[in-house]
Structures are given as structure tokens and as C-alpha cells.
């Protein structure tokens, strides 16, 4: 029997080793604070996440993820994002590999837009990062730092620093963040310019100096497609869009899809792109300043199949002055539903960029995102005061008042809380049962529900009675607020809103602007309840009322259940088999003879000592 126990122990260890090996080599780490991918596939991990591991997630990460989740039904051309122009990095670091570390950090901070300027070198016919050509009569090492001059401007450029380095850095970020919990949709915006010269007798010397040689292709690619090709597994291409538009015409549509089907240009929802098409990035030429000449770059069919241009995808890029005027129109209280519908249906991919003459401010950025614009930070430095930085950064370094932050990475981090169209800066509050840790023994208190305030969404006590927002089921910019009715979040049911409306929340910035407009027109009082809470799981904000389930809860599918019980089932079968073998081999001849012998001895003993009656 002792041997049987030892065998059972060894079999148990073996089963654990065999069946746990696969789970230990999972493609994705479910620790949401440091999730990385170990695969080169662009497929997003479909495994569910244990949300309890993210209880201490930074406020910013929760806000980013929540804004993404509520925007899932929205077409990608309407989803608000924020990002940086690499010019702001190169202005400080030079066109060198040193800028890659800063790009990596900016991506990890949540940059969802990267604006990249590419230069078509008419001397060598390649796309390059450096705004000036390299003289070919000088021998360079790949890591040579060279001061090159063109059009009376001098630039610090590293000879071997190419577009491939930028694409590889973005690819590594996309790969490492390719999980259900951390996946976001990015925009790679291209600004095309020429290194141009007018061919004449006077430029013969220039042609000799900058003529291509055997190392020309080291510093760039000959086509736009080749330039972005390292990102191809993740790119949402014009071909993918065309396929979607063809299939959408014959599919059953949700209320949101029916509304946006009225648009002059239909795009798939964020949810479809990320989780059905499994794409992470679109590449869009937002500005084409190529000089028309005999040596100008000719866009190829392969370029058009993988990259969007203005004639294949409409977009708008405004400067700060134009953006201010745009926001004045959008946030005008005289607007009606039709105004907001036109913005949602007939304007697409709305960006605003700044420059060193007029930089973004926190207040300005906040206004831009509220009126439906996506800010792209393009200046080389920003003014950030000590107070505002201290409220938004975990770093030990604080700038003095009005100090210029030459490190754009630090400035962007300080601006992050102002980049959300949804949550107010510093929201959502987490790990609090009550505000100020005040708990009354005779009253229910639960800061788990979200309400609208003048500066965005805030977490409020679910038991407090506020006015609440009702949205038209078929028209997402049509809102109703009853100024005579106040309810706690828990008491807002299906009968709380008029027919054709339900208790809901804004899912993009234009809907939010329309709701602000109604609140002002109806003289409603803030806060106003919207349908969003983290009642079920802390930091997992969901819509659908107080009983809505977090999509990231750890669930057990049939397949997973079989995998879970398989080891114990096999161990049980092995044990039964061993018991059967033991019983089988116990019946040997020696044991049989022994039994017969003792049976005979006992029979003879009873025969000799047979007694009558009951012994006294």
C-alpha cells in the first residue's frame, strides 16, 4: 500500500507538469500592470482578464481604458485620440537614434497619434527622416552624427537613423500591448515633403555632391509602402475598409450603425476594427507638400492599397486659431440636434496641431477635445506650471512656475488628464468608499457611479438623487433631461425616461457636447447621472445599470473547464487502474496456500474441541 501511495504522488506531480506547461507559456501576461506579448502574430489575445489584479491601476490607465470601452460602438473616424508630432522630439534630440527611447516612453504613456514628416530626396529617390541630403563625397559610419545644411537650415542627423527604426519601435509597442485589456487604435499620420532642387547648369555640382551611391538605400526606402511595411500585420488598410463597406450593406445593423449609415463616408466601429478585423493602426497622408517636378515621387498602386490619402479618406487638420473658431461654433448654446448630427455624419478624423508660436495650453486642449478635436502636440516645448504638473504626475521632478519643459515627454505626461473628452482631470477617483473617507453609520454611501459635471465625468455617491440623462434610442445626439425628477442611480429604471429614450451616456465627444447643450438649455443642475458605474468590479466601468457585468471578469468557458478538470480526471483513472492491479496481483499462489492451510488448522481444532450447549 505504501508503494501505491508513492506512485499516486508521482503521478500527481507528473499531471501538474504536463497540464500546466501550456498555461505557463501563455502568449500574454494577465498581470495588467505589465502586460507583454511573446508572439509576432497580430491576433489579439481573447483570454479574459482577472480584473482584481488591476485594483491598483493608475487613474490614467483606467480613464483611457474606460473611454475606449464606451466608444466601442462608434466609427473609428469619430473616436477622440491624442498624440504627438515627432518633429517635437527631433527638435530636441536631433534626427538620431536617441529619439527612439523618448518615442517608446510616449507610446507607453498613451500616445495614440504619431505625426511623422517624410522627405523625398530627389537626388537619391528615397524617403528619409533627415530634412537635408547627405553629401556622398564623404564616408560615413552608420552611427555618424552629421551636421547637414539645406536651404539655409542646419540639422543634426545620424546617417544610419532611418524610417525602419521608427517603424520597428512602433511595432514593438503594438506587439507588447496586443491584449484585450491594453489594445488601442492608433493613427500614423504622414506629412510628405521634398528635398527639391531645380535642375540647371548651376546645379550640376549639387548633383555630383548628393548623387546616389551603393549605400543610398541604407538611409531610406524607395516607396511609401516599403516605408510602413514593418507595421503591415496591424495596418487597417483601404482594402479592409472597402471589404467592410461591401459586407455592411447586407448585414443587420444596430441603432448606432443605422445612424452612421447616413454618413457620406462610412467606417467600421472601434469594436469591429480592434476585435473582429484585429487591426491596430491606420496610415494616413494628411499633408502632401511634394514639389511637382520630373523627379517627384509617384504614388504606386501598392501605396494606395495600404495607405489612406485625402481622396480615399477625408480628414481635417486645423491650427490652433482655426480650432478656436471651430469650437466656438460647436459649443454655441444656440445649436440644435441637426448641428451635432452634421458634425458626426459629415466631418471625419478632426485633428488640431500647435506650433512654437502658439502652443497648446491645458485649458485650450481641454476645450478642443470637448468640441470633438484630436490634439497633436507639435511644439518643441511647453509651459507647465508647478501646480498643474504636481496634480497629474508621479515623478519626483517638479518644474518651477512657468518653466519651459524642453522634454516633450514630460510635458505630454502633464497634459494627459486634459486629453480626455470624458473624465474630468484627476478622475475617476479610485479606492474610495466615501469622499474624504467620511462614513455615516446610518446612511448608505457608495462612490461607484458616474455623473456629468461642467468639466467632465466624475465619480459620485450612487445613493444621491440627481437629475439624469436620457438618450434617444435612434438619434445619439438627441438628449432629454427632466428637471422635475431626481433619482439615485439605483432607482433609474426603464420607466424613468420618456418613450423612445433610455438612460444612457455619451459615447463620443460630439454626443457629450450635445448633452452639455441640453443641460444648459433646460437649466438643469449638475451633477447629472449618466449610465456608467464600477459597482460590480472596482475600476471596471460599465454601462447597463447597477447589475452590468465587467467584461474583464475571469470566466470559465467549456474548453477551459475541460482543460481544468482533465488533470484530476486522468489522475483518478490512473489511481483506479493501480488499485485494480494491486487487487489482481495480491491473489498469488503463496497467499492462496496460506489461506487453505489456516482454514484446515481451524477446522481440525474445532472438530477436536466440539462442545454442546452454551459455554459457562
From Swiss-Prot:
Record field: transmembrane: 565-585
Keyword NAD annotated: no
Positions on the Cytoplasmic side per record topology: 586-616
Keyword presence, Transmembrane helix: yes
Membrane topology category: Single-pass type I membrane protein
Keyword terms, alphabetized: Glycoprotein, Membrane, Signal, Transmembrane, Transmembrane helix
Extracellular side: 21-564
Signal peptide: 1-20
GO cellular component: membrane
InterPro entries: Telomere_Capping_Maintenance
Subcellular localization: Membrane
Domain of life of the native organism: Eukaryota
Positions annotated with a glycan in the UniProt record: 24, 31, 34, 38, 50, 137, 147, 152, 201, 221, 250, 264, 310, 342, 378, 386, 394, 402, 431, 472, 502
Family, per entry: Belongs to the MTC6 family.
Functional summary from the UniProt entry: May be involved in telomere capping.
Name used for this protein in its record: Maintenance of telomere capping protein 6
Lineage per the UniProt record: Eukaryota, Fungi, Dikarya, Ascomycota, Saccharomycotina
Gene, per the UniProt record: MTC6
Amino acid at each position: 500500500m505504501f508503494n501505491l501511495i508513492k506512485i499516486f504522488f508521482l503521478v500527481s506531480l507528473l499531471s501538474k507538469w504536463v497540464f500546466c506547461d501550456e498555461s505557463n507559456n501563455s502568449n500574454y501576461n494577465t498581470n495588467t500592470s505589465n502586460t507583454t506579448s511573446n508572439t509576432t502574430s497580430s491576433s489579439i489575445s481573447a483570454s479574459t482578464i482577472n480584473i482584481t489584479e488591476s485594483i491598483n491601476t493608475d487613474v490614467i490607465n483606467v480613464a483611457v481604458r474606460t473611454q475606449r470601452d464606451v466608444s466601442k460602438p462608434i466609427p473609428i473616424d469619430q473616436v477622440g485620440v491624442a498624440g504627438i508630432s515627432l518633429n517635437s522630439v527631433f527638435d530636441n534630440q536631433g534626427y538620431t537614434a536617441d529619439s527612439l527611447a523618448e518615442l517608446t516612453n510616449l507610446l507607453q504613456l498613451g500616445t495614440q497619434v504619431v505625426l511623422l514628416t517624410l522627405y523625398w530626396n530627389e537626388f537619391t529617390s528615397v524617403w528619409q527622416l533627415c530634412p537635408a541630403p547627405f553629401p556622398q563625397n564623404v564616408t560615413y559610419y552608420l552611427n555618424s552624427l552629421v551636421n547637414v545644411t539645406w536651404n539655409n537650415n542646419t540639422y543634426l542627423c545620424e546617417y544610419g537613423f532611418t524610417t525602419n527604426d521608427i517603424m520597428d519601435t512602433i511595432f514593438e509597442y503594438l506587439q507588447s500591448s496586443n491584449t484585450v485589456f491594453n489594445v488601442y487604435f492608433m493613427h500614423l499620420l504622414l506629412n510628405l515633403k521634398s528635398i527639391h532642387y531645380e535642375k540647371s547648369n548651376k546645379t550640376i555640382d549639387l548633383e555630383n555632391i548628393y548623387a546616389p551611391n551603393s549605400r543610398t538605400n541604407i538611409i531610406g526606402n524607395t516607396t511609401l509602402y516599403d516605408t510602413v511595411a514593418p507595421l503591415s500585420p496591424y495596418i487597417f488598410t483601404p482594402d479592409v475598409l472597402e471589404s467592410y463597406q461591401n459586407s455592411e450593406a447586407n448585414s443587420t445593423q444596430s441603432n448606432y450603425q443605422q445612424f452612421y449609415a447616413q454618413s457620406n463616408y462610412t467606417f467600421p466601429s472601434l469594436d469591429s476594427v480592434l476585435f473582429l478585423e484585429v487591426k491596430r493602426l491606420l496610415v494616413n497622408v494628411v499633408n502632401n507638400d511634394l514639389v511637382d517636378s520630373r523627379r517627384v515621387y509617384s504614388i504606386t498602386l501598392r501605396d494606395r492599397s495600404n495607405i489612406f490619402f485625402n481622396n480615399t479618406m477625408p480628414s481635417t487638420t486645423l491650427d490652433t486659431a482655426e480650432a478656436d473658431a471651430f469650437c466656438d461654433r460647436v459649443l454655441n448654446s444656440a445649436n440644435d440636434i441637426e448641428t451635432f448630427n452634421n458634425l458626426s455624419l459629415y466631418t471625419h478624423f478632426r485633428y488640431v496641431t500647435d506650433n512654437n508660436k502658439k502652443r497648446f495650453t491645458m485649458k485650450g486642449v481641454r476645450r478642443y477635445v470637448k468640441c470633438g478635436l484630436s490634439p497633436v502636440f507639435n511644439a518643441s516645448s511647453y509651459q507647465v506650471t508647478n501646480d498643474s504638473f504636481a496634480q497629474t504626475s508621479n515623478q519626483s521632478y517638479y518644474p518651477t512656475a512657468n518653466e519651459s519643459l524642453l522634454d516633450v515627454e514630460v510635458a505630454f505626461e502633464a497634459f494627459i488628464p486634459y486629453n480626455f473628452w470624458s473624465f474630468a482631470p484627476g478622475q475617476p477617483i479610485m479606492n474610495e468608499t466615501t469622499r474624504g473617507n467620511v462614513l455615516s453609520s446610518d446612511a448608505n454611501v457608495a462612490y461607484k457611479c458616474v455623473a456629468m459635471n461642467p468639466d467632465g465625468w466624475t465619480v459620485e455617491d450612487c445613493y444621491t438623487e440627481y437629475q439624469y440623462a436620457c438618450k434617444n434610442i435612434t438619434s445619439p445626439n438627441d438628449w432629454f433631461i427632466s428637471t422635475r425628477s431626481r433619482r439615485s442611480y439605483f432607482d433609474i429604471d426603464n420607466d424613468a425616461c420618456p418613450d423612445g429614450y433610455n438612460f444612457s451616456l455619451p459615447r463620443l465627444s460630439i454626443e457629450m457636447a450635445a448633452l452639455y447643450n441640453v443641460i444648459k438649455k433646460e437649466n438643469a443642475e449638475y451633477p447629472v447621472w449618466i449610465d456608467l458605474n464600477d459597482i460590480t468590479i472596482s475600476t471596471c466601468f460599465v454601462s447597463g445599470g447597477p447589475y452590468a457585468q465587467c467584461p474583464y471578469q475571469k470566466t470559465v468557458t467549456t474548453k477551459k473547464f475541460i482543460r481544468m478538470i482533465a488533470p484530476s480526471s486522468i489522475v483518478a483513472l490512473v489511481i483506479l487502474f493501480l488499485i485494480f492491479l494491486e487487487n489482481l496481483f495480491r491473489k498469488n499462489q503463496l497467499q492462496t496456500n496460506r489461506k487453505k492451510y489456516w482454514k484446515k488448522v481451524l477446522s481440525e481444532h474445532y472438530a477436536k474441541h466440539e462442545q454442546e450447549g452454551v459455554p459457562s
